[in-house]
């Protein structure tokens, strides 16, 4: 339950999760994201990644290891997610949680809008299908990385209703596709 998660992890009601450990994102940038969210009365918690040692620059953090269901609930009950990995992005979209994505995937390709070959990043493809490229950047194109003020604005301006509608549409499309496959 939400109460269980809030109590177990000692979370404030208005919390945002940040999970950025790529070397191209500075500790200063991450700390400034925390400051900007605090101005809007949100507490930022560092969500650790299983495959990387965490940078300890934020005031609050979730301790690792995390039970998979608790990990899911941490995202589900949050007010926002700022991070780089695909699975938390999917979890956020599934629950219409506002997000800002820092994509670390993809092969660089000149003259592409986000500095990558769009077909080489699953995160880009997902965010693009949801129409959320304003909430997206790629480390392969450093100029696309938003300022902390822009990140907070993107998260707070997130259209949850549009996200829910798109998720439902994609679920319907998937179910239709699977039904068509089963009819063959």
Regions found by a protein language model. Give the residues of each.
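Active-site anion-handling motifs in enzyme catalytic cores
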Residues: 1-184
């Amino acid at each position: 339950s939400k109460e269980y998660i809030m109590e177990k992890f000692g979370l404030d009601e208005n919390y945002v999760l940040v999970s950025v450990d790529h070397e191209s994102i500075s500790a200063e940038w991450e700390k400034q994201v925390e400051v900007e969210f605090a101005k809007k009365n949100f507490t930022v918690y560092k969500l650790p990644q299983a495959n990387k040692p965490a940078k300890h620059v934020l005031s609050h953090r979730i301790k690792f290891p995390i039970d998979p269901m608790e990990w899911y609930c941490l995202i589900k009950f949050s007010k926002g997610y700022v991070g780089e990995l695909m699975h938390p992005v999917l979890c956020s979209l599934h629950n219409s949680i506002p997000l800002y994505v820092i994509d670390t995937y993809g092969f660089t390709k000149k003259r592409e809008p986000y500095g990558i070959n769009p077909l080489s990043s699953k995160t880009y493809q997902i965010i693009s299908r949801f129409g959320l490229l304003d909430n997206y950047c790629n480390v392969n194109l450093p100029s696309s990385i938003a300022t902390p003020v822009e990140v907070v604005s993107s998260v707070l301006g997130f259209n949850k209703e549009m996200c829910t509608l798109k998720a439902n549409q994609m679920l319907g499309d998937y179910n239709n596709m699977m039904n068509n496959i089963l009819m063959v």
